[in-house]
Regions:
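Membrane-proximal N-terminal segments immediately preceding the first transmembrane helix
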Residues: 16-40, 82-94, 279-290
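Membrane-embedded alpha-helices of multi-pass membrane proteins, especially ion channels
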Residues: 53-68, 312-322
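Alpha-helical transmembrane signal-anchor/signal-peptide segments
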Residues: 65-87
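Soluble non-transmembrane domains of integral membrane proteins
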Residues: 99-238
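Extended, hydrophilic extramembrane loops/domains of integral membrane proteins
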Residues: 118, 253-288
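Juxtamembrane interface at the cytosolic side of transmembrane helices
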Residues: 293-343
């Protein structure tokens, strides 16, 4: 029996050592389990592309039809609601005192079944800016015990040492344009209940948290809040606090719960309060219906149609190649060492 002598003079029996450390044999540990290794033959590739194309193209058509079935009215008013004399200095006008009532007329070109959703759309407003997004405190919004936790809310954190509730730039810049609608000299009521996410109302905004010291010092960023209502009931704030990812976004203002008929004229009396002029932003009023896919958005339908069309094109191309110039699977003549030097 062979043996080895270690540096310390100890003697080990190599045969016994190897046998004692050998793991128990298993097909799993030795990677000998039976396995299926599918081969992508040309027929399988053609069939896969064909199935994807046949499924995606009709899906794209359905999505586009649903999107085009949405009736939408968009009215940009930020420029038209500035008096001619003030259009060279819009910021001075919007930050000045006095009512900024603006009357608009909207024509319904296609019937809109209720509910008709009322949105405001802002452009060139970067709610995703890091400093802006971080200037808030979610714990303060939920619980009165965290009222003084405003360390992340600068510069809108306190007034004369007293905390601002809700604190931060996001709440401070609350959108405050208002809209009133009428038809045939009769008011069209706008329902502002349940315009926010239920999960936000119940879990992110406390029922016993009330506004304090909000918008009480200059500069005023946006809208004010009712100090007698808890944050969980201030749905305009809840909608606004769900920040947008892109510089152009829409937020729900309310719902008109009656049908609007084709050819009708809707009169809008709005308060043009919100300052988008200092950053060259745009404001638009949007009336829209919905479909089973939501609002109007052609992207999903176009994406399905594009992918499906490409797959059908590839399926046809590979089928033609397969018929015109077939190649037997596993043919050794195509191996590089079996080809002639000139081939």
């Amino acid at each position: 029996m062979s043996s080895t002598v270690g540096g310390g003079g100890s003697v080990e029996t190599s045969g016994v050592r190897r046998t004692s450390k050998r793991p128990k044999y298993s097909k799993f540990t030795q990677q000998e389990l039976p396995a299926c290794k599918p081969i992508l033959t040309l027929r399988w590739v053609i069939l896969t592309f064909l199935v994807v194309g046949v499924v995606f193209v009709p899906l794209g058509v359905f999505c586009l039809r649903a999107s085009h079935g949405v009736v939408e009215i968009v009215d940009r008013y930020d420029t038209d609601c500035i008096p001619e004399a003030s259009r060279n200095n819009k910021v001075a006008y919007i930050t000045g005192v006095g009512d900024k009532i603006c009357n608009r007329t909207i024509t319904v070109h296609k019937a809109m079944k209720h509910p008709v959703y009322v949105y405001y759309q802002l452009e060139n407003f970067y709610q995703n800016h890091r400093r802006y997004v971080k200037s808030r405190n979610d714990a303060q919004l939920r619980s009165p015990s965290d009222e003084r936790d405003v360390k992340t809310c600068a510069p809108e954190d306190n007034v004369d040492g007293e905390p601002i509730v809700p604190c931060g730039l996001v709440a401070w810049s609350l959108f405050n344009d208002t809209y009133r609608f009428s038809r045939n000299n009769q008011q069209l009521p706008v329902n502002k209940k349940d315009i926010s996410w239920k999960s936000d109302r119940e879990k992110k905004f406390g029922k016993n948290v009330f506004p304090k010291n909000f918008q009480t010092r200059e500069p005023i960023g946006g809208g004010t809040l009712d100090p007698k209502k808890p944050l969980s009931e201030q749905e305009d704030l809840i909608v606004w606090m769900r920040t947008a990812a892109l510089p152009t976004f829409r937020k729900l203002y309310g719902k008109i719960e009656t049908d609007l008929h084709a050819g009708e004229t809707i009169r809008v009396s709005l308060q043009n309060n919100y300052n988008t002029y200092s950053f060259n932003g745009e404001k638009k009023l949007v009336l829209s219906t919905t479909s089973w896919l939501g609002g109007r958005n052609d992207f999903l339908g176009i994406a399905y149609l594009t992918v499906g069309s490409i797959c059908l094109f590839l399926a046809v191309t590979f089928s033609v190649l397969y018929l015109v110039k077939p190649r037997q699977l596993g043919d050794p003549t195509y191996l590089s060492w079996n080809r002639s030097a000139g081939g």
